[in-house]
């Protein structure tokens, strides 16, 4: 039913993500990031166009028999993934996904043991209720449940929400290690410019339901004024770099995307490898 109050959550979306890449989708609140990610495994279906993952295609207006295949290939870790826990024990919770896709119980339980170790938890937790664990442990158990389904694509929707800086770094480092070890395609939806700069190969910038820009963190973070127009800030390290350049009258060749980048550039400057 048409209405003058109709509003499109997404429009003119045309993007291609390389297999094995780590892509950050960034945008201000309400830009359409979370709506986009829910299309990636068929939680939402497109009203126009199509979504393709390898040979799996979901088309608008058609009965799509490949939804189950798509949902196995694309694992989503939502904000506060611990809210997804529901089983009596950690073992049952992690095993549920694989068994739902037809994996035998004993194989699913073996996969659960492997995934629990992969996320840095002890097998001693397998028989415990997930609701007896600490918040950080619950989050890792929920992540293990997603990984147990052997996804080809891992979508992370603000996965560090509610964590302190140390916990956030631990979780993000873990995802990056999993990305490299498992040759996963990883899509990070985030408000954190620091996380996008530190981990992503490519970035997609969303604003008001459409894609405004895409490219490497290096290239996009050089467009400070455009980023501000899309309601986005720069990483703190790049802000620091600009203040330093203004104060010392120098110009660094590369943007300082991380603290490590900043330390290396400053060290080179004061050791005389860069001239004022």
UniProtKB/Swiss-Prot annotation:
Intrachain disulfide bonds: none
SUPFAM superfamilies assigned to the protein according to its UniProt record, in alphabetical order: P-loop containing nucleoside triphosphate hydrolases
Membrane topology, record value: Peripheral membrane protein
The protein's enzyme class: translocase
Compartmental location: Cell membrane
Pfam families: ABC_tran
InterPro entries reported for this sequence: AAA+_ATPase, ABC_transporter-like_ATP-bd, ABC_transporter-like_CS, ABC_transpr_CbiO/EcfA_su, ECF_ABC_transporter_ATP-bd, EcfA2, P-loop_NTPase
Record-linked CDD domains: ABC_cobalt_CbiO_domain1 (cd03225)
Main location: membrane
Annotated keywords: ATP-binding, Cell membrane, Membrane, Nucleotide-binding, Translocase, Transport
Gene Ontology CC annotation, any one: ATP-binding cassette (ABC) transporter complex
Record: residues binding ATP: 27-34
Active site (record annotation): 158 (proton acceptor)
Annotated ABC transporter domain residues: 1-233
EC number(s) recorded for this UniProt protein: 7.-.-.-
MF term (GO), any: ATPase-coupled transmembrane transporter activity
PROSITE patterns for this protein: ABC_TRANSPORTER_1, ABC_TRANSPORTER_2, CBIO
Function comment: ATP-binding (A) component of a common energy-coupling factor (ECF) ABC-transporter complex. Unlike classic ABC transporters this ECF transporter provides the energy necessary to transport a number of different substrates.
Record family assignment: Belongs to the ABC transporter superfamily. Energy-coupling factor EcfA family.
Subunit: Forms a stable energy-coupling factor (ECF) transporter complex composed of 2 membrane-embedded substrate-binding proteins (S component), 2 ATP-binding proteins (A component) and 2 transmembrane proteins (T component).
Name of the featured protein: Energy-coupling factor transporter ATP-binding protein EcfA2
Species, as recorded: Bacillus subtilis (strain 168)
Gene name per UniProt: ecfAB
